[in-house]
Amino acid sequence: MAAITENLSNLKVSGDEEKEKIKMHPYGINVIGVKQVPKSKVSTLPKAEERDVNTLLEKYKDSIEELKIKCKDVLSLNGNDPGIDLIYDDLFLLRYILSKKNNLKKAEEAIRICCKWRADPEVREQMLKPVADNTWTEAPVYKSFCKHMVFGVLGSQVDGGILFYLRDGLGEPNAVFESLSRDDFLKIGFQSREYVYRWCDTETRRLGRFVKAMFIIDMNKVKLSQMPDSRVQKCYAELGEFSENNNPQMVDKYLIVNAPSFIPWFIKIIGPLFPRSMMEKFDIFPSTPNLGESEFGKTWINLEYLPDYLGGTFPTKDLPKELSGELVQRGDGDLNKITVGRRSRKYCEVMTPTKGKVDYKFALVSKGVYLTAMFHKNPKEVNKEQESPDQIVIQEKLKISAENGVYSGVWEVPESGILIVELSNAHSRFTGKTVKWNLDFI
């Protein structure tokens, strides 16, 4: 795979500029409607002077040189894999200078966090490599994410910047932790931002113009009950802090369209959780005219691939499945449901015909319970307290909570018998707990 951080000189094509052949970057290959602008047209784009890289490099050259000295030790941490590693050059430093408004102390702090994070072997292998290989969307955790969230990329801005859509009204975002742990959620968030950042950095280097992302958040038919709960809010806030350090100058706007009347209030409530610089990029677009019919839309978006429900000309029926809502899981999927009353215990079980493995999944609607798993060789010897003489502890007593998302994995059982899981709510004086669960012998 060609590295997406190739230098500008490597992407130039000789010959008539009007017939310039543009090499599509790897992340746009599988996206419908991406249009890359020829270099010869850069001066005609909106905010041409404001986003000109060479002008900004010259303006902040002294700050760049100072940061090079201050950050020399961490800038040397960069690896040698062009598919994974960014180019730690003047443009890289300029991003931080602009984002931190030329506060070099804050810029240095963020650069150090970013470089150390990217140098971590586990991060490189688990987070960055799948994005570099363009395989991250094939992972089971990503597919589980798509059962609850409707999001994806379609078309592009007039300068080739990415258009990232979120359609909250079609999804069930607060059910996401029935399929994912909190760490899984954050992993998809980190990888999504890496994908967007790579896209923007590639085009920025090719054009010599800061190319940024635009997130279009469609709130059509969203109910207040569908708005992110505290668990999702905390994850989004952590991802916002992450982007502050790792993805400077990546986002131009978070554009909210079809906003219900309660959205300004909701944003005011959750705003303190997020970085101020992130909240400053949120815009609530008026209901009329439609985005595609507005001056802003006509100026910034290739309307041919803007969905028709937003005033563009791309048919809704032709939307990719990740944006149509057809991947969303309605109901509880493969999960059973059990209610554990206050001061009580409930049990889940699965028969095991031989030595093998049991795939388990437990998700709470709210709060937490204590979980213990025991294996019993002879089901007939299990008494009413769910104990037997030769029982084997498979999982020691562990508190699982809604806050941490789904608790899932694989337990090994030694032979034929029965695995019994105790869910204890004995500690709760007043409230029962609802647990969604599944056990499968594999």
Kindly give the residue locations of the regions a language model identified.
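Basic, amphipathic alpha-helical/coil surface patches used to engage anionic, phosphate-bearing ligands
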Residues: 2-442
